[in-house]
């Protein structure tokens, strides 16, 4: 029997990769703001109109507001509300809708070093989101905490990100022990 999956944020780097990795015999519904072409057939729900979710075996939440590199360290005031609206409010709204639809299992993308009491706004919001997801009472909660996301994107990445990625690829070869998780 095939499984049913919901993927929120299916147009980003992780969401697109995830959708294309799910076996073709499985039923996938993507929740996104715009349609894109996948290597497999998908059902489409518009994120802005999504109030009630269809039942599924598992929900993947891969949402994230697009930030500039500098915003990860010290987020500009003009970005904070937009970031929180997506990375906390929208993530929680979708998770709550999933709970109402009797979805028992959820996986969500967070960030390495996320913590609700972090002094870094980005990490603090991610940590608060993780806690709220756990509080919703799903039977299974998977929280993935990647470091910097590398991969082919639809949009051209900026020069500062290219330089950062170049140096982190080199530095990654020298990270070991406790620092290995930052590769």
Model segments located where?
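NAD(P)H-binding glycine-rich loop region in Rossmannoid oxidoreductase-like domains
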Residues: 37, 42-93, 97-100
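NAD(P)-binding Rossmann-fold cofactor-contacting core
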Residues: 28-38
């Amino acid at each position: 029997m095939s499984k049913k999956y919901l993927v929120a944020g299916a147009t980003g780097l992780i969401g697109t990769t995830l959708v294309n990795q799910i076996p073709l015999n499985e039923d996938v519904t993507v929740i996104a703001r715009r349609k894109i072409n996948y290597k497999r057939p998908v059902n489409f729900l518009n994120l802005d109109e999504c109030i009630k979710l269809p039942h599924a075996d598992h929900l993947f939440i891969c949402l994230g507001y697009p930030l500039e590199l500098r915003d990860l360290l010290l987020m500009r005031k003009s970005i904070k509300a937009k970031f929180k609206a997506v990375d906390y409010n929208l993530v929680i709204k979708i998770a709550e809708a999933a709970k109402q639809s009797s979805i028992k299992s959820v996986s969500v993308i967070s960030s390495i070093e996320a913590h609700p009491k972090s002094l870094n706004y980005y990490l603090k919001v991610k940590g608060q989101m993780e806690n709220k997801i756990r509080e919703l009472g799903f039977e299974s909660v998977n929280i993935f905490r990647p470091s910097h996301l590398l991969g082919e994107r639809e949009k051209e990445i900026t020069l500062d990100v290219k330089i950062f990625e170049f140096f982190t690829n080199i530095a990654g070869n020298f990270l070991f022990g406790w620092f290995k998780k930052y590769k």
